[in-house]
């Protein structure tokens, strides 16, 4: 009996403008998967849209239809076998012709297709495969015209996008270009087999004492005939077989077995334990011959969202294996506009950065796509929790019957595809669609529980989020929590801070509050918040070609910042807080300081609130990454170069973090006067699961001289509350009559004799401070073939020492505050002897 054979159709393709009938219209495609812009660039028909104003010169592609074709030779077909043509992803309106005959019409980018082409390929020899990709941009506009009664309320992009099941950011977003891709964006192949394992998944039941786990493995088998098959299941850990069992495949194509695992090794998010992965495999056997084999890795763990009434309202936090997890992390957008260009290695580097930054959760945002398997594999292996949105974003989606059916198929396919990943702990119905409902005044009666009524309102999309999607998750991944939207909380106003999750945009957007009070603006789980910053100069040098354009307000820089009102917002936060500059390099740095400070103030306070009966369950900043070289809210740019905010967040998310802050008086109000006194607070946050003892030292250091202006405070043998907050000082007082000199509050904490964390509180705003002549010393103290260690010291307090980010180089820490009497070490990996030292910059330099 022949085993399943795969024949990828990745080479030999050509493509053309569908309307171009000339003989020389066809152009070669280097490799499939691809999208049309990649292929046009490869043929020198399109400039790089990521550079300068080139995006505008590529817009013509958005309004074209494209045809791809190839020929292939029919593979040998053993007796009793069939040939299938499999598409893992077609973007988006695709008509597939085999030897001139239409065999598939697809209108959903997020679906895979498998077609039995045995009869169509009866003839030996070469066969033609042609795919027409109709213009999604124009089709969307036509679909919108056909339903004039629907309220097409939306944020970002053309509202017609709501009619098409395609990545919504392709229509342009407030951080990305308008690039309407089309093409074979995931693998296409031929498969020859008599039978195959169509799906393999597990149900994990973990005993409450974690001493035993029952693993039930399920296989779904597809066969081209009625032959009987056996399914041989194997369970293993780190390559060592733990169990094996063989069963007959039932007439309906199903097979299942159960394994008992004693003293299982659990899957944990990083920082809490090992991300242990078991492997289950199933071999499909006929007459002792293996015809197909599939393996999947999975984790033994429990995960839940805890929502309980408390003094703050109703909690919203994650609990894994019985341990409450403060979910500090980021939101994720697609890593490129050309999705096929994102390799497994590139995905892994992004997730490695998450771990390096001590971030424990990543939110896959609903305007992008259900990511490649390699993305989730990396999260599984490295212990990063995934908050997974369904692909609906910022709009009131129509609910035509054919569209609802497509959405149901899409959600079933993707939940089934991803359900074995232990990293995925929540499925969420949409991004900000309930905010669109509020903004547009659409009907939403939470007390009306009749789904058929929802379809009759001007907010019919509720039917998707509160009926279709929860039903799919319940059927195919019942152990995974489902949340109707982000933000959403029990049908209340999406800005309600007492319930559910919230997107807090009153820093930057909205009322543009001071970032120093960010922590007072949060809710039970802050799943979006952000502050823009320019990327590093090396990234700007990539997309700004002309030196004459390298000034802060240049047209090309404005063009690469898609956020509405970005200039006045950046200007406001700069002018309120810092001494501004007109040269681009300093301007870039100053925006990065503001972003780093904003993230620090938010995260630091919200993590502290975790210890107050889980007042804040987590914080996911907007956003981790970029889809092109740009100016945005990302804390790591398109080229994986971290901005200073990345390091600021990492320090606050240290397993033990110490915090100090004084009361900051608003200096921008009428008749603002210097305060006579300020209160200050001191605390320790810990994610450790056991109590430890520590020593905490607080010093008061003059910014002008570096000397201590008052007696230091030392707390010895402090019992640090596990997985919570230890408040040491809640009513400290600074009397500026007694200590008028501007000074910082510098705190350190030692555990078991090791210095584990620092924090420095500065007078606000920085623009009032003289930060010249700091006496900074950056000394190389050790060097090996691939690593350097720097020793940092200063005679006076230094604010935000930022190192140059260089390709292939990883820095242990940056955006560092340095105070006298506290030397710090920074490790730099990827630096070789003889390499030029990393440049650096600090405030007031």
From Swiss-Prot:
**Where in the sequence does glycosylation occur per the annotation?**
717, 723
Q: Name one GO molecular function term.
A: beta-mannosidase activity
- Which residue ranges traverse the bilayer? none
- The answer, when asked if Hydrolase is one of the entry's keywords, is yes
One Pfam family this chain carries?
Answer: Mannosidase_ig
Active-site residues from the entry: 432 (proton donor)
User: Reaction catalysed by this chain?
Assistant: Hydrolysis of terminal, non-reducing beta-D-mannose residues in beta-D-mannosides
Which EC number applies?
3.2.1.25
Quick one: which pathway? Answer: Glycan metabolism; N-glycan degradation
The GO annotation for biological process reads: glycoprotein catabolic process; polysaccharide catabolic process
Q: Is Glycoprotein set as a keyword in this record?
A: yes
Sorted alphabetically, the keyword list is: Carbohydrate metabolism, Glycoprotein, Glycosidase, Hydrolase, Polysaccharide degradation
Q: What else is known?
A: In contrast to clade A beta-mannosidases, which are likely secreted, clade B proteins appear to be intracellular.
UniProt similarity note: Belongs to the glycosyl hydrolase 2 family. Beta-mannosidase B subfamily.
Record function comment = Exoglycosidase that cleaves the single beta-linked mannose residue from the non-reducing end of beta-mannosidic oligosaccharides of various complexity and length. Prefers mannobiose over mannotriose and has no activity against polymeric mannan. Is also severely restricted by galactosyl substitutions at the +1 subsite.
Write the protein's name: Beta-mannosidase B
What taxonomic classification does the UniProt entry list for its organism? Eukaryota, Fungi, Dikarya, Ascomycota, Pezizomycotina
């Amino acid at each position: 009996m022949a085993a399943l054979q795969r024949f990828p159709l990745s080479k030999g393709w050509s493509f053309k403008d569908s309307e171009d009938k000339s003989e020389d219209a066809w152009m070669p495609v280097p490799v499939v998967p691809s999208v049309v812009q990649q292929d046009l660039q490869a043929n020198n028909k399109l400039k790089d849209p990521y550079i300068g104003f080139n995006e505008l010169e590529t817009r013509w592609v958005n309004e074209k239809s494209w045809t791809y074709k190839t020929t292939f030779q029919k593979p040998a077909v053993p007796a009793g076998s069939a040939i299938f043509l499999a598409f893992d992803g077609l973007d988006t309106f695709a008509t597939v012709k085999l030897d001139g005959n239409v065999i598939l019409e697809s209108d959903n980018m997020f679906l895979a297709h498998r077609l039995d082409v045995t009869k169509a390929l009866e003839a030996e020899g070469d066969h033609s495969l042609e795919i027409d990709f109709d213009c999604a941009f124009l089709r969307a506009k036509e679909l919108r015209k056909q339903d004039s009664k629907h309220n097409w309320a939306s944020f970002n992009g053309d509202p017609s996008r709501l009619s098409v099941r395609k990545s919504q950011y392709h229509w342009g977003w407030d951080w990305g270009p308008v690039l309407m891709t089309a093409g074979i964006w995931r693998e296409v192949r031929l498969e020859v087999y008599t039978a195959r394992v169509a799906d393999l998944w597990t149900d994990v039941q973990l005993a409450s004492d974690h001493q035993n786990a029952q693993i039930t493995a399920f296989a779904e088998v597809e066969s081209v005939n009625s032959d009987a098959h056996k399914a041989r299941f194997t369970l293993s850990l780190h390559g060592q077989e733990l169990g094996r069992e063989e069963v007959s495949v039932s007439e309906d194509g199903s097979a299942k077995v159960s394994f008992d695992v004693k003293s299982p090794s659990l899957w944990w998010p990083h920082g809490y334990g090992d991300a242990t992965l078991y492997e289950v495999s199933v071999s499909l056997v006929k007459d002792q011959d293996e015809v197909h084999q599939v393996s999947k890795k999975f984790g033994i763990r429990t995960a839940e969202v805890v929502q309980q009434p408390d003094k703050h309202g109703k909690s919203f936090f994650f609990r894994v294996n019985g341990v409450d997890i403060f979910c500090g992390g980021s939101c994720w957008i697609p890593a490129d506009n050309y999705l096929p260009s994102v390799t497994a290695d590139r995905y892994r580097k992004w997730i490695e950065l998450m771990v390096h930054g001590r971030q424990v959760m990543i939110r896959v945002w609903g305007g992008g796509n259900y990511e490649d398997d390699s993305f989730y594999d990396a999260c599984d292996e490295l212990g990063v929790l995934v908050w997974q949105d369904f692909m609906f974003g910022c709009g009131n989606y129509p609910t035509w019957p054919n569209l609802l059916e497509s959405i149901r198929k899409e959600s079933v396919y993707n939940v089934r595809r991803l359900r074995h990943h232990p990293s995925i702990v929540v499925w969420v119905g949409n991004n900000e669609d309930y905010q669109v409902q509020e903004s547009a005044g659409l009907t939403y009666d939470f007390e009306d529980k009749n789904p058929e009524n929802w379809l009759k309102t001007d907010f019919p999309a509720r039917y998707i989020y509160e009926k279709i999607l929860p039903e799919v998750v319940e059927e195919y991944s019942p152990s995974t929590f489902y949340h109707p939207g982000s933000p959403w909380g029990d049908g209340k106003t999406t800005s309600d801070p007492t319930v559910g999750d919230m997107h807090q945009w009153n820093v930057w957007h909205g009322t543009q509050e001071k970032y120093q009070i960010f922590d007072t603006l949060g809710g039970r789980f802050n799943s979006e918040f952000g502050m823009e910053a320019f990327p590093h100069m090396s990234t700007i040098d990539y997309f700004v070609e002309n030196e004459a354009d390298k000034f802060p307000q240049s047209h090309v820089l404005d063009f690469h910042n898609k956020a509405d009102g970005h200039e006045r917002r950046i200007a406001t936060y700069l002018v309120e807080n810092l001494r501004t500059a007109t040269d681009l390099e300093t301007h870039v740095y100053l925006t990065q300081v503001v972003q780093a400070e904003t993230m620090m103030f938010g995260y630091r306070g919200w993590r502290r609130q975790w210890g107050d009966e889980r007042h804040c369950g987590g914080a996911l900043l907007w956003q981790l990454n970029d889809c092109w070289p740009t100016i945005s809210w990302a804390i790591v740019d398109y080229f994986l170069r971290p901005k200073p905010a990345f390091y600021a967040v990492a320090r606050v998310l240290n397993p033990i973090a110490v915090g100090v802050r004084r009361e900051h008086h608003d200096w921008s109000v009428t008749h603002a006067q210097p305060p006579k006194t300020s209160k200050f607070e001191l605390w320790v946050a810990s994610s450790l699961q056991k109590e430890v003892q520590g020593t905490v030292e607080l010093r008061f250091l003059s910014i002008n001289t570096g000397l201590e202006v008052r007696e230091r405070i030392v707390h010895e043998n402090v019992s640090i509350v596990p997985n919570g907050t230890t408040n040491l000082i809640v009513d400290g007082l600074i009397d500026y009559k007694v200590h008028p000199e501007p000074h910082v509050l510098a705190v350190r904490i030692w555990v078991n004799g090791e210095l584990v964390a620092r924090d420095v509180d500065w007078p606000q705003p920085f623009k009032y401070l003289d930060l010249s002549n700091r006496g900074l010393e950056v000394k190389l103290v050790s060097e090996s073939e691939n690593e350097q260690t720097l020793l940092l010291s200063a005679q006076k307090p230094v604010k935000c020492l930022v190192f140059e980010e260089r390709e292939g180089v990883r820095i242990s820490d940056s955006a560092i505050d340095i105070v006298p009497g506290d030397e710090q070490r920074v490790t730099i990996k990827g630096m070789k002897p003889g390499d030029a030292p990393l440049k650096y910059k600090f405030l007031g330099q």
